Amino acid sequence: MIEPFLLGIILGLIPITLIGLFVTAYLQYRRGDQLDF
């Protein structure tokens, strides 16, 4: 059984991780678009 506190941390980190990955990919895409890769 998962503790509510641990579950809360996991549910809190997942959206942050997804947003971080999305922003990183977007910045790399923009950077690559500017450099014409």
From Swiss-Prot:
<dbReference type="GO" id="GO:0045158">
    <property type="term" value="F:electron transporter, transferring electrons within cytochrome b6/f complex of photosystem II activity"/>
</dbReference>
<keyword id="KW-0812">Transmembrane</keyword>
<keyword id="KW-0934">Plastid</keyword>
<dbReference type="GO" id="GO:0015979">
    <property type="term" value="P:photosynthesis"/>
</dbReference>
<feature type="transmembrane region" description="Helical">
    <location>
        <begin position="5"/>
        <end position="25"/>
    </location>
</feature>
<dbReference type="InterPro" id="IPR003683">
    <property type="entry name" value="Cyt_6/f_cplx_su5"/>
</dbReference>
<comment type="subunit">
    <text>The 4 large subunits of the cytochrome b6-f complex are cytochrome b6, subunit IV (17 kDa polypeptide, PetD), cytochrome f and the Rieske protein, while the 4 small subunits are PetG, PetL, PetM and PetN. The complex functions as a dimer.</text>
</comment>
<dbReference type="GO" id="GO:0009512">
    <property type="term" value="C:cytochrome b6f complex"/>
</dbReference>
<keyword id="KW-0472">Membrane</keyword>
<protein>
    <recommendedName>
        <fullName>Cytochrome b6-f complex subunit 5</fullName>
    </recommendedName>
</protein>
<dbReference type="GO" id="GO:0042651">
    <property type="term" value="C:thylakoid membrane"/>
</dbReference>
<dbReference type="Pfam" id="PF02529">
    <property type="entry name" value="PetG"/>
</dbReference>
<keyword id="KW-0813">Transport</keyword>
<dbReference type="GO" id="GO:0042170">
    <property type="term" value="C:plastid membrane"/>
</dbReference>
<keyword id="KW-0249">Electron transport</keyword>
<comment type="similarity">
    <text>Belongs to the PetG family.</text>
</comment>
<dbReference type="GO" id="GO:0017004">
    <property type="term" value="P:cytochrome complex assembly"/>
</dbReference>
<keyword id="KW-1133">Transmembrane helix</keyword>
<comment type="function">
    <text>Component of the cytochrome b6-f complex, which mediates electron transfer between photosystem II (PSII) and photosystem I (PSI), cyclic electron flow around PSI, and state transitions. PetG is required for either the stability or assembly of the cytochrome b6-f complex.</text>
</comment>
<dbReference type="InterPro" id="IPR036099">
    <property type="entry name" value="Cyt_6/f_cplx_su5_sf"/>
</dbReference>
<keyword id="KW-0602">Photosynthesis</keyword>
